[in-house]
Each structure stands twice: as C-alpha cells, then as structure tokens.
C-alpha cells in the first residue's frame, strides 16, 4: 500500500513538472486593472511632501534599500532575473498602468502591499515620509538601464 502511495505521488508530481501559468489574457488584464484602480484606497490623498529634487533624492535612497530587489535600480526591472518569470510578472514602475495610480493609491500600495502578487506592505517598516518620498521618486524614475544592475545580481 505504501509503495502504491509513493508511486501515485511520484506520478502526480511528475505530471506537474511541465506545468506553467500562462500570462493573463486581455479580459483578465482589463478586469484586474479596473478592480485595482477602483478598490485601492487613498485615491484622493495628496503627497504632502514637496515635489522637488531633494524629495526625489530621499525617495531614491529609500527605494535603493527596500525596492531594488524586485524593481531594479531604475524601477523598470533592469537586471532582475526573475521579474518576468513569476505570476503575475513584476511591473515596470514607469509603465502607464502604474503611473496612472494617484499618489495616494501608490502610497496605499506601499503601505499594504498587493496580495497575492508578492508585493509586500511596508506599514510599520517605513515612515510615512519615506513612503511618500518613494512615491515622489516613482514619478521621476531614471531611464531604463541607466542605473545598472542591483549589486545582489552581479556576483
């Protein structure tokens, strides 16, 4: 009986070896985008920090500590080996979809994360000023590839 269970488990797992999630279709993507834009909180909340190079620099500093492992140094996945191979794929923060969120929505995402996408929430880890500065930095991302590859992926 035990060998039968082991054989059944091996066959089942072997059958899953070639399985892979397919990318979402257009309808799924549009539905999810609609839902995200209508159900993510803080839609009308404004960034209280000044929109200036000092704030962007503070945001870049915080971003470089907390965000580069998944979003790359430039926020556009440059050098992140797994970015397009997980489901859902990690978005480029310069994409029209991400940039269409309000500042308040981006702050809400940073605070709460997006389950089950792998985007963690930072509430309690980062201060409000750090989070708002990251939002400001996201509005002024450098060109793709201009910041190099995160150190963790170069060795």
What are these regions (language model features)?
Residues 1-5:
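Bacterial N-terminal signal peptides that target proteins for export
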Residues 6-12:
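Sec-dependent N-terminal signal peptides
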Residues 15-18:
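C-terminal motif of bacterial Sec signal peptides marking the signal peptidase cleavage site
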Residues 20-22:
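Bacterial signal peptide processing site
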Residues 24, 41-42, 64, 87, ...:
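Flexible coil segments in periplasmic/lumen-exposed cytochrome c-class electron-transfer proteins
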Residues 27-62, 149, 155:
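Electrostatic cytochrome c docking/interface patches
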Residues 53-78, 83, 106:
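Sequence/structural segment immediately N-terminal to covalent heme-attachment motifs in c-type
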Residues 97-109:
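Short Fe-S-cluster ligation motifs
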């Amino acid at each position: 009986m035990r060998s039968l269970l082991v054989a059944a488990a091996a066959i089942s797992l072997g059958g899953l070896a070639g399985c892979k999630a397919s990318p979402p279709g257009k309808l799924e993507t549009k539905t999810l985008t609609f839902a995200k834009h209508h159900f993510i909180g803080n839609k009308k909340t404004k960034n209280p920090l000044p929109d200036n190079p000092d704030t962007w620099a503070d945001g870049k500093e915080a971003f470089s500590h907390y965000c580069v492992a998944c979003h790359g140094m430039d926020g556009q996945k440059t050098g992140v080996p797994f970015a397009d191979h997980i489901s859902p794929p990690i978005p480029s923060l310069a994409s029209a979809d991400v940039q269409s969120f309000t500042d308040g929505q981006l702050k809400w995402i940073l605070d709460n994360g997006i389950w089950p996408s792998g985007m963690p929430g930072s509430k309690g880890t980062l201060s409000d000023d750090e989070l708002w500065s990251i939002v400001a930095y996201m509005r002024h991302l450098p060109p793709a590839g201009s910041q190099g590859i995160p150190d963790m992926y170069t060795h």
